[in-house]
Structure formats: C-alpha cells, structure tokens
Regions:
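Noncatalytic, solvent-exposed loop/strand surfaces
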Residues: 5-202
Length: 202
C-alpha cells in the first residue's frame, strides 16, 4: 500500500457499505512471494470475531477462560465454562492496547471458543454483542459503558445452540439487533441511549 494513502476505515462486519467490497485505491493486486511485511502483532484471546477499524483504532472481541477451566474436546458439548468476554481497543499504528473492557460471561454453548460478532463503530460509539447475548454500547475514547442490555433477561430468550452471532446494524438513529424469541426476533434500539423503539417477528 502506498505510504501516501490513508487506509479506509472498516467499521464493522463486511465494511462501511456492508457488502464486503474494499474500495480503497492503490492497494496491491497480489502479495509478494514471501507474503506481506508484518507491521505489528498483538496477542488476542479465543473467539471467532473479526476486527473493526476506525479512526486509527482496531477493535476486536475475545474470550478469556478462568484459570483451571478448559473447553471440551467435543465442540458440540454444552457444559458451562467460566470466563470473561473482552473488548480490546488497539492502536492501528503499533498494535498497543489503548484500553480494554471485560465482563463475566460463563458459556454454555457449542463451539465455546469465544465471541462471534464483529464490533460495530458509529461516530464515537462502539457496539458489541457477546455469544451469550450481552449487548454493550461503549465510548470509543476510553471504553466507558454508555448503555447495555442482556437479551436473555430483557426478552426472555435462551441463548441459541451456537450463541448469538449476528452483528448489529445501524439505520439512521436505530441500532437493529437479532435477539430471538417470541415477537422479538428483531429489536431496534435508540442507538444513543439504548431505549427500545420497536420489536418485530416471531
């Protein structure tokens, strides 16, 4: 990539247009024989979540299991595994941790490695949904919680076999999520304060 270009942001799942298309100009059309040069590396815990990039920061979720705990050899097993889910904010220039936030989150799902959803960046907020249905809105500057909810308790739903795995969608002033449950398959929140605006589908 040309050093004179500023890389486009990738603020959520499938990019800024949600279509998986990279529109930046001047990118490589093929990698060097020995692969692209590594700029930095950063340790990240377990999980399936992809990174989001915005305003010089990289956001990614992972999971840290409690000391002495371990995931079952059979990925379909649904035993309870104690641990925390975590959101990391890294400096895109050097990979150093800017801030991190974690919360207690025992897993009782199949394929229990970690979170599934990519963080979503909108203005000065970052939204995350954990595998057990914990939805958080945090400040991008320091990770401070702005609002949160728990799908299991708020909508009386059970965590799906594979966990909650749908990244939320921003539409105008709404944050739209797939919560599941009777009448709450899709739920829209005010993206700023977390108040429910509507719910739909069974």
């Amino acid at each position: 990539i040309s050093s004179t270009l500023k890389a486009d942001d990738w603020p959520g799942w499938f990019g800024p247009e949600r279509d998986g298309v990279w529109r930046e100009e001047g990118i490589l059309d093929k990698f060097p024989q020995k692969g692209p040069k590594t700029i930095w590396k950063a340790p990240v815990g377990r999980g399936y979540a992809g990174p989001a990039v915005a305003d010089g920061k990289v956001y990614i979720m992972d999971r840290q299991i409690d000391k002495g705990a371990k995931s079952p050899e059979n990925p379909f097993s649904k035993i309870t595994i104690p641990g925390n889910e975590r959101l990391l904010c890294l400096d895109a220039k050097n990979g150093e941790i800017v801030w991190e936030k974690s919360y207690n989150c025992p897993y009782s799902i199949s394929y229990s490695a970690g979170p599934r959803t990519t963080p979503l960046i909108d203005e000065n907020r970052v939204y995350t949904i954990g595998a057990e249905g914990n939805l958080y809105c945090r400040s991008t500057s320091d990770g401070k919680e702005i609002w949160s909810t728990d799908f299991n308790t708020a909508f009386n739903v059970k965590t799906p076999t594979w966990g909650f795995s749908s990244t939320p969608l921003i539409y105008e002033n709404l944050l739209i999520c797939l919560a599941g449950g009777e009448g709450t398959v899709a739920v829209a929140f005010n993206k700023s304060n977390g108040k429910e605006v509507w719910r739909s589908l069974s």
